[in-house]
Amino acid sequence: MSLISIVCLIPFGLIGAVNPIITLSAYAVLGGMYLFVVPLFLFYWMNNRWNVMGKFERLFIYGLVFLFFPGMVLFAPFLNLRMNGKEES
């Protein structure tokens, strides 16, 4: 990257994009959120609100499930979200 292009990036606060450590750490943080944090939150949300969700909330959650599908598939084999059945007396 030439000196002129680096100088042009300084006013916009994008000089950190030149440093590969900052770039790689940003990728790691965003990838971790995409694959781990948000899918686990979605599993938690769906498990707690499955029977009381409204139609717009359900539509929004299904959209997020579609968006974060790789992370959902990553955790699906390890999480049991089946509802409790009726106990026999």
From Swiss-Prot:
GO terms for cellular component: plasma membrane-derived thylakoid membrane. It is found in: Cellular thylakoid membrane. Keywords: Membrane, NAD, NADP, Plastoquinone, Quinone, Thylakoid, Translocase, Transmembrane, Transmembrane helix, Transport. GO terms for molecular function: oxidoreductase activity, acting on NAD(P)H, quinone or similar compound as acceptor; quinone binding. It is a multi-pass membrane protein. NDH-1 shuttles electrons from an unknown electron donor, via FMN and iron-sulfur (Fe-S) centers, to quinones in the respiratory and/or the photosynthetic chain. The immediate electron acceptor for the enzyme in this species is believed to be plastoquinone. Couples the redox reaction to proton translocation, and thus conserves the redox energy in a proton gradient. Cyanobacterial NDH-1 also plays a role in inorganic carbon-concentration. Belongs to the complex I NdhL subunit family. This is NAD(P)H-quinone oxidoreductase subunit L.
